């Protein structure tokens, strides 16, 4: 990740502490222990203890889930055939355990702490290998890391304070049972980046940035709640907590993953607000065709001129052979995809496409895009 950031021109300053933030009419200045840095916007993504969030006085809404778990990362020295190739949640009444298959030879175990157990005793080598004994020995693997984390379930009550935005764990924290912590931070970045660019380029009004929090906070809260229910289900199945009256919902029955309910989206089609799938078109992943901004995917070439007229250079126009797109793409219609790859609208015909496009451009604060565009 660091190499990728440097490759695109990011100036990384590691080990630098932010000591204060000051806003002024044209931007914001971050004061650090090595100097000051000024920009138009500041994104605070400095983790769960976020000093910037605290300095801004932004509070957390606590969903009432706090558990200590020992996290062990190991690197296998040799194949261990008895290890599962799949992630496992072991609901052991004596101690719930999570097993995760990492990249290459890396494996992770997570052990829930019992009342009275301390962090220091749990990370001691002897205790670590005692816990790992059912799966492997020091001859099988090298211990890379042993640390006790406290799993939280919290969501900030705001993700914006004028020119400062919160992202990642600074804005929301969740137990890891759905594997959605990093994913949620990536969704934050994907949601905010294109909006900052439109505003910074003078294409959209600053009010567009308010949709960052109005879109991300409800979604993040829904994911946190789902993760909490999964954690409670683990305790219930382990016999460590009373059985829920709604086990079906806890297992996921009738509970779809949260979608983008409000914000830059139009219409009530079932695909709107969901992330676009990744089909292969003419041997290429759809993402390779969509570009990095808005995209209009049209079924056949019937709406190409309309898409170009409405969206101009704001969107890539992607034409797929009629009837071949494994997406919620109506015959002869179009799907409008946001830069963060959420479906913004689905149109069945030219009239619906025009109305949906105009509504979206109005939401973005854009009257009409520049009519210069290349078509794929």
For the regions a language model picked out, list residue spans one by one.
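Core Rossmann-like FAD-binding/catalytic domain of the broad FAD-dependent monooxygenase superfamily
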Residues: 1-242, 318, 370-376
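Helical substrate-recognition/capping region of FAD-dependent monooxygenase/halogenase enzymes
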Residues: 2-9, 130, 198-376
